[in-house]
Swiss-Prot record:
Chain segments annotated as transmembrane: none
Entries under Pfam families matching the protein: Pectinesterase
Signal peptide feature range: 1-19
Full protein name: Probable pectinesterase A
Catalytic activity: [(1->4)-alpha-D-galacturonosyl methyl ester](n) + n H2O = [(1->4)-alpha-D-galacturonosyl](n) + n methanol + n H(+)
GO biological process, one term: cell wall modification
Gene: pmeA
Organismal lineage: Eukaryota, Fungi, Dikarya, Ascomycota, Pezizomycotina
Pathway listed: Glycan metabolism; pectin degradation; 2-dehydro-3-deoxy-D-gluconate from pectin: step 1/5
Record's keyword terms, sorted: Aspartyl esterase, Cell wall biogenesis/degradation, Glycoprotein, Hydrolase, Secreted, Signal
KW Secreted (keyword) present: yes
General function of this protein: Involved in maceration and soft-rotting of plant tissue.
Origin species: Aspergillus oryzae (strain ATCC 42149 / RIB 40) (Yellow koji mold)
Subcellular location(s) of the protein: Secreted
InterPro entries cross-referenced by the UniProt entry: Pectin_lyas_fold, Pectin_lyase_fold/virulence, Pectinesterase_Asp_AS, Pectinesterase_cat
Length: 324
């Protein structure tokens, strides 16, 4: 009797221990409850149709997008909290994303930066998961993948791809995590207060990563690049050809902290653009061959990292998905 109980106890312990080390299922291959669906067998065949169907409601809404490439140009202006989910086998990383929204037009052709955007978000409280957004125009002109022009926007394990002016973080508070941002010239730009965490920031040509446009001392906006990996696109030699940023407007404010800066970063670090600019550029506890600050230009000193509360506001936990 005692032997049987002992065997059962050992079996129970063994099963419990095995279960503890099994990887948790992080996939999303079907629509979360209550979401409308987009895809060949979904409620709608295009994302644009699904957005239009939301109408003037102010209720929380969600859209699940099945795997595929969607050649669309979208404007999101919904009055309620909207969540967009892309199909994936691993929600924690952009590397398994299967949904791409793409469009190809330059800003000169479209008439403005905003009009060139593949996705233009104008409404607050939008959360985007596991979706790739691209502008396929390439080099030669500004061509925006995403305009994020609203407050309390969250992007989780997404990809943004372009060349010049990829990600227009234009206004409001914005959060990007586990994502990939690719471009060459000013490819993260605007005057949002934006936090980038655990992101791959990938240069596909010589140029400048950030072009922040803060203009007044009363403007509380920051770009905080935290625990990110700066790198060159595969097969591209950019040694010394990339700058951390240049000021689109005179009081640009950017910090790189706890990030990996490789040898693609020019020793000067930062560059000029706006006439009379006095930008606030900071670096704190970075590593890598490009992290030496001894030859930096335009660099200000800072004694501690910037916090999420400073960049996103004291209430950020109310709208940021803390499971990432």
């Amino acid at each position: 009797m005692h032997g049987s109980l002992l065997k059962l106890a050992l079996l129970s312990f063994s099963l419990g221990s095995s279960a503890a080390v099994l990887p948790r299922d992080t996939g999303r291959t079907s629509a979360p409850s209550g979401c409308s669906t987009v895809g060949t067998s979904g409620d709608y065949s295009t994302i644009g149709d699904a957005l239009t169907a939301l109408g003037s409601s102010t209720a929380d809404a969600c859209i699940y997008i099945a795997a595929g490439t969607y050649e669309e140009q979208l404007v999101i202006n919904y009055a309620g909290h909207l969540t967009l989910y892309g199909e994936t086998t691993d929600t924690q990383t952009y590397k398994q994303n299967t949904v791409t929204i793409t469009h190809t037009i330059s800003s000169p052709e479209a008439g403005s930066l905003d009009n060139s955007a593949t996705v233009n978000i104008k409404s607050d409280l939008v959360s985007v998961y596991n979706i790739n957004i691209a502008n396929g125009y390439g080099s030669g002109a500004q061509a925006v993948a995403l305009v994020a022009n609203a407050d309390q926007l969250g992007f989780y394990a997404c990809q943004f791809t372009g060349y010049q002016d990829t990600l227009y973080a234009k206004a409001g508070h914005q959060y990007y995590i586990n994502s990939r941002i690719e471009g060459a010239v000013d490819y993260i730009f605007g005057d949002a207060s934006a936090w980038f965490e655990n992101c791959d920031i990938v240069s596909n040509g010589a140029g400048y990563i950030t072009a922040m446009s803060r203009e007044t001392t009363s403007d509380t906006a920051w770009y905080a690049i935290d625990h990110c990996n700066i790198k060159a696109a595969s097969g591209v030699d950019l040694t010394g050809d990339v700058y951390l940023g240049r000021p689109w407007r005179v009081l640009a404010r950017v910090i790189y902290q706890y990030s990996v800066l490789p040898d693609i970063i020019n020793a000067k670090g930062w560059h000029s653009m706006a006439d009379g600019a006095t930008p606030l550029y900071y670096e704190f506890n970075n590593t890598g061959a490009g992290s030496d600050t001894s030859d930096r230009e335009y660099l200000s000193t800072i004694d501690a990292p910037v916090t999420k509360e400073t960049v996103l506001g004291d209430d950020y936990k109310n709208w940021v998905d803390l499971s990432y």
